Amino acid sequence: MFKSLAAVLPRASKAKFLQKNYASTLAFIESSKDGSVSRSSLSLLAAAQKLSNPITAVITGSKAEKTAEALKSSYSCSNLEKLVIFEDSKLDTCLPEQLTPLLVKLLKGGDYSHFVVSNSSVGKSVLPRVGALLDVQPVCEVTVIKDPKTFIRPIYAGNIISTIECQAEKKLLIIRASAFPPIAEGSMDSVTIEKRTDIPPCDLNVTWVKTILTKSERPELTSAQNVVTGGRALKDKETFEKLLSPLADVLHAAIGATRASVDNGLCDNSLQIGQTGKVVAPNLYIAIGVSGAVQHLAGMKDSKVIVAINNDPDAPIFNVADYGLQGDLYKIVPELTEKLGKYK
């Protein structure tokens, strides 16, 4: 086919160069209401670093430039090379119908081998749409990145750990933020910021009506360092609040709940932890009156220290707990709250 080895080498060298150039990652960064970088996005960048590719981060919304500057001046991500910002207030709501055309345009216009989002409500809404338009099957809830094409994720409520080798030209990943520590603090003077305004129109007739925010001084559930969770055993809404709130106040903790608690009207469904709720991995997780259904364990078993309080010695929650207190939670929890308050 080739007349000489000299003819082969230049072509091989060029092919290698093109392949290396193509290995790059696009990461979607979310910001908080004040323009700071969301904690899940900091973990997302930590995961993206494990792909060992140059990283381009895209930031949208009216505070995109503020978020970009905060990321550049306050954190360190070794592979991050460029921040692409689309500063427009119409993107503040993060409607997937508006974000999807923009992200698809970026992916088609750049040589990206990977596109990563966090497992936030925005990420979970956007990536399936992007995948459909690119005809690529996303890999969801990635907890381990072994190499640029091999990923590990839990399935069947965490009972099976699946290893996936993705052969797609563009790999779309939803990263479980709780599985990766956030990037370290520092600064990135060499990172460039590119401002763009070429936002493609949304073909769908979708309008954001209003935002209803639940005001709370407690930490956000998915990023809290300590979580206190109540189960079905708490019986009613008043008991749920009366027992859990003082303990959560002492520990500066977020409050969570099982699906049974939510279904029984003990609390709002925004507190639900588990397979059909939120996934948390705090430093301390206290389960009060939680039996330990498989679906609930899927959302909290990666917690660093798990404390279970239950009067049933055979409750499944004790199988994953680091510390267990068997007894009447109506006596144990107030006493624990009082002693922790004195220690504080």
UniProtKB/Swiss-Prot annotation:
It is found in: Mitochondrion matrix. SMART domains: ETF. It comes from the Eukaryota. Gene3D superfamilies: HUPs, TPP-binding domain. The keyword Transit peptide applies. Keywords: Electron transport, FAD, Flavoprotein, Mitochondrion, Transit peptide, Transport. The keyword Cell division does not apply. PANTHER family: ELECTRON TRANSFER FLAVOPROTEIN ALPHA, ELECTRON TRANSFER FLAVOPROTEIN SUBUNIT ALPHA, MITOCHONDRIAL. Belongs to the ETF alpha-subunit/FixB family. The gene is AIM45. GO terms for cellular component: mitochondrial matrix; mitochondrion. The electron transfer flavoprotein serves as a specific electron acceptor for several dehydrogenases, including five acyl-CoA dehydrogenases, glutaryl-CoA and sarcosine dehydrogenase. It transfers the electrons to the main mitochondrial respiratory chain via ETF-ubiquinone oxidoreductase (ETF dehydrogenase). Present with 2950 molecules/cell in log phase SD medium. One of its GO terms (molecular function) is flavin adenine dinucleotide binding. CDD domains: ETF_alpha. Heterodimer of an alpha and a beta subunit. This is Probable electron transfer flavoprotein subunit alpha, mitochondrial. Transmembrane segments: none annotated. Its main location: mitochondrion. InterPro entries: DHS-like_NAD/FAD-binding_dom, ETF_a/b_N, ETF_a/FixB, ETF_alpha_N, ETF_asu_C, ETF_asu_C_CS, Rossmann-like_a/b/a_fold. FAD binds at residues 284-312. The lineage of its organism: Eukaryota, Fungi, Dikarya, Ascomycota, Saccharomycotina.
